[in-house]
Amino acid sequence: MIEREEEVMYPNMFNRDEVFFRLGVEKSEDLLQTLRNVKNPNFQDDKGISYLHRACQAHNVEAIKILLELGANPNINDLQGTSPILEAIGRINENNNEILEIMLQHGLDLEKMEGGMTLKDMIESFKDDEMNKIVKKYYHK
């Protein structure tokens, strides 16, 4: 293990730490407590993948809430230009609507460009009535 900024780093080619790995496979109270104490809620690996990306990939609602409350940026991009919300809603999951609403409550920008269209237009293209209701509730232009 490598020590970096007082956090234990696992030796790997993308500079990912223990929290990063755990977010992908674990939903324990211990992980949530560890998250509450992270120094940088916007941590990104060498590919630009953030803790929030990982929590969204895992559809871990509680981890997402904690990260956003600590100041994680809901509009952060990885190096490919993908924001965390697409990691969640890009795959069918029962938590998608809740995740979308939480992200919007914390400043997710529906006008943000994702793959040549706004996030709002992309979400509407899914033709999911519940998601579209959530978008309508938060979209003010």
Language-model segments: what does each one mean?
Residues N12-F21, Q44-Y51, N77-I89, M113-D121:
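Ankyrin-repeat boundary/"N-cap" motif
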Residues D30, E62-A63, E98-I99, E130-M131:
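Conserved ankyrin/ankyrin-like repeat signature
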Residues L23-G24, C56, I89, E124:
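Specific position within ankyrin or ankyrin-like helical repeats
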Residues I2-R54:
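N-terminal segments that cap or nucleate solenoid repeat domains
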Residues E26-K27, H59, I92-N95, K127:
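Ankyrin-repeat intra-repeat helix-capping/turn positions
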Residues L110-H140:
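Leucine-rich solenoid repeat scaffolds
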